[in-house]
Amino acid sequence: MAARLCCQLDTARDVLCLRPVGAESRGRPLPGPLGALPPASPSAVPTDHGAHLSLRGLPVCAFSSTGPCALRFTSARRMETTVNAHRNLPKVLHKRTLGLSAMSTTDLEAYFKDCVFTEWEELGEEMRLKVFVLGGCRHKLVCSPAPCNFFTSA
């Protein structure tokens, strides 16, 4: 999966939030067992897409009556899953957000590619982490996302 992601720690729920960033979502269909989801039809996005709201970093399809493309994609692909290994991952990424020494970007990419998805699918524990994968969504973001830690997962 090639995507530019924003990582933010939600300290209230002790979970890590991952979301796409940039002028527009650049999600592509995923190869392999997850398959691909075709882009959402333009009619799924209402004319009044809620740009007046103070929500930051959400694509305009987030205000669709049928829900955002990402949510539809992840629901279809069962990607709202549990986290098993490295319970300190949210704290590690939060340290990177603060500019403190932690995992390197390369280590993070390897972690996501080689560990996380397998563990989410095959194992499971109580701590929950929602991941929204923009599979084919081409809707522009309402406004620029808040500053946070970026990395590219190749």
UniProtKB/Swiss-Prot annotation:
Keywords: Activation of host NF-kappa-B by virus, Activator, Apoptosis, Host cytoplasm, Host G2/M cell cycle arrest by virus, Host mitochondrion, Host nucleus, Host-virus interaction, Modulation of host cell cycle by virus, Transcription, Transcription regulation. GO terms for cellular component: host cell mitochondrion; host cell nucleus. A fraction may be phosphorylated in insect cells and HepG2 cells, a human hepatoblastoma cell line. Phosphorylated in vitro by host protein kinase C or mitogen-activated protein kinase. N-acetylated in insect cells. The keyword Lipid biosynthesis does not apply. It holds the Pfam family X. It is found in: Host cytoplasm; Host nucleus; Host mitochondrion. The keyword Transcription applies. GO terms for biological process: DNA-templated transcription; symbiont-mediated activation of host NF-kappaB cascade; symbiont-mediated arrest of host cell cycle during G2/M transition; viral genome replication. InterPro entries: Transactivation_prot_X (IPR000236). Residues 68-117 are annotated as: Mitochondrial targeting sequence. Belongs to the orthohepadnavirus protein X family. May form homodimer. May interact with host CEBPA, CFLAR, CREB1, DDB1, E4F1, HBXIP, HSPD1/HSP60, NFKBIA, POLR2E and SMAD4. Interacts with host SMC5-SMC6 complex and induces its degradation. Interacts with host TRPC4AP; leading to prevent ubiquitination of TRPC4AP. Interacts with host PLSCR1; this interaction promotes ubiquitination and degradation of HBx and impairs HBx-mediated cell proliferation. Multifunctional protein that plays a role in silencing host antiviral defenses and promoting viral transcription. Does not seem to be essential for HBV infection. May be directly involved in development of cirrhosis and liver cancer (hepatocellular carcinoma). Most of cytosolic activities involve modulation of cytosolic calcium. The effect on apoptosis is controversial depending on the cell types in which the studies have been conducted. May induce apoptosis by localizing in mitochondria and causing loss of mitochondrial membrane potential. This is Protein X. It comes from Hepatitis B virus genotype B1 (isolate Japan/Ry30/2002). The gene is X.
